[in-house]
C-alpha cells in the first residue's frame, strides 16, 4: 500500500511539474529555472544584431498620464516648433487644430508642427520599433500629412539616437537637424536611454525555486493521496483527504491552543484594568493632599 501511494504521488508530481513547465515556459539551467523568452523584441526596445547589446527606449515614452506632455523641439529657421512623442501617439489635445494633408488617423500621430496657430501637419504616425542601421540606433515615423505640392508623397521623420551619459546635461535633448523639401525631417536625440544596458534577468531566484518545489510537492501529495483514498480505499467525503486523521488531530490541537491563548488574554485583562483604576485612585488621593497643603 505504501509503495502504491508513493508511486501515485511521484506520478502526480511529475505531471504537475510538466504542466508548470509548459505553462510558465520554465527551462532548467545551471543557475536554476529560467523563464523562456519570446523571439520577439520587447516593446520599444531591441538587441543590437551584431553585439547583442540591449537598448531600451521605453523610458522616453510620454503617455496620457504624463504631466510633461509631448517633447517640444525648437524648429529654429523652420519657423515653428515641433511636438514629438516616442513609441506612443502624441498626447496633446488636437481638437482645436485643423489637421491638414489628408491624415488617415489623427489618433496615431507621432509628431507634428502647426502653422498659423490652427493648421496642424503630421510628420509621421507613431512608430513602436526602433532599429539599427549600422551602428546608428534610429526610429522612423512614416505616413504623415501629404507633402507640399504632392498628391501621393507623405511627410516622414527620421530620429537618430545618441548615447549621452553626461550627468551635467539634460537627461534628454532633442535637436532639429534639418529637412528635405519640407517633407522629410531629421532629428538627433541624445539620451542615456540610448546607451546599452543589461536586460533584466528572467532567472528565478533561489527563494522562488524553493517555493515552486514546495507548491509542486504539496499538490503532488494532495492529488496523489486523494486519488489513493478514493480509488483504493473507497473513501468518501472529507476522508478522501490524505492522512485525514492526522490533519484532523492537528486542526484540533491548533484550535485548543487558540482557545487557551484567548482565555489567558481574557483572564489577564480584568486584573490589568483593576490595577489601572487603583493607580488612578492613588494619583487622585495624592493630588487632593497636595491641594490641602497649599490651602493651609
Swiss-Prot record:
PROSITE patterns: MRH. Residues 42-197 form the MRH domain. It comes from Schizosaccharomyces pombe (strain 972 / ATCC 24843). The keyword Disulfide bond applies. Pfam families: Man-6-P_recep. InterPro entries: Man-6-P_rcpt, Man6P_isomerase_rcpt-bd_dom_sf, MRH_dom. SUPFAM superfamilies: Mannose 6-phosphate receptor domain. It is found in: Golgi apparatus, trans-Golgi network membrane; Endosome membrane. Residues 26-206, 271-296 are lumenal. This is Putative mannose 6-phosphate receptor-like protein C530.09c. Residues 228-249 are cytoplasmic. GO terms for biological process: late endosome to vacuole transport; protein transport; vacuolar transport. Glycans are attached at residues 64, 81, 93, 96, 143. Disulfide bonds join 44-87, 147-183, 163-195. Coiled coil: none annotated. The keyword Signal applies. GO terms for cellular component: endosome membrane; Golgi apparatus; late endosome. The lineage of its organism: Eukaryota, Fungi, Dikarya, Ascomycota, Taphrinomycotina.
